[in-house]
Amino acid sequence: MTAELSPIDRAKYVAARRAVEYVEDGMRVGLGTGSTAAWMVRCLGELVRDEGMQITGVATSTRTADLARDVGVTVKTLDDVRWLDLTIDGTDEYDPNLNLIKGGGGALLHEKVVATASDQMVVIADPTKQVDTLGAFPLPVEVIPFGWQTTKALIEEMLSNLDVLGRSASLRLSGAEPFRTDEGNLILDLHLRRIAQPAQLSLVLNQIPGVVENGLFLDICDVLVIGNADGTVEVRDINNGTIEHERVDVAETDNLFVEVKE
């Protein structure tokens, strides 16, 4: 039951429920990765099961693809569908301009490719992810394994010339071993604390040999849905310049997400 969920889980739940209202029958939908995105995938499964909607999902990770298949969503590759009507994904941070830091789940490369291949990107979040300036959450950077320590040194040297508060990078681990992305790459987490010029940082990072992609998602998000534990949501549409406040009805018998809490 939703009453058994923590306040943060309830907030993610209502954001996901509101976000899937953008999905229409026959759409090709990009499926994000992470705990919040997992709730959204379950909601899509409910639409398929209860309303008979035909939805084609393009997953940004193997674990999202597995979950989507489990709940009845048809999964295809981006090469199969070429272009998407909509992508729904979570975020690790968002600023007032709806710029994002993503990649905490390790799927930033696939997430950025899918988001940029979509007509619209809807981001779901809870209020704890809001910041005045990006950088409190470590910035993930995907790098190739070959020479990664040299790449790390080049990144840290570059950071000394930019307007950031922190300048250290750490290799992401999974247990005692380096974390590997679905592409077999590594992730360096940059501990910057504040990013004054995210566009400049993104450009410079991607020019460093060995860097595949970074977790700055700039000017990509079209709509941000912020869920609250009391069932209210705030919907920010950057293209229309609107901010709307709504309520999502959540039945106390609804238990779609109890088993996917992280």
From Swiss-Prot:
Disulfide bridge positions per record: none
Enzyme nomenclature, EC number: 5.3.1.6
Pfam families in alphabetical order: Rib_5-P_isom_A (PF06026)
Binding site for substrate: 33-36, 89-92, 102-105, 129
Annotated catalysed reactions: aldehydo-D-ribose 5-phosphate = D-ribulose 5-phosphate
A cellular component term, taken from the record's GO annotations: cytosol
Family membership noted in the UniProt record: Belongs to the ribose 5-phosphate isomerase family.
Function (record text): Catalyzes the reversible conversion of ribose-5-phosphate to ribulose 5-phosphate.
Protein name, entry field: Ribose-5-phosphate isomerase A
Organism: Jannaschia sp. (strain CCS1)
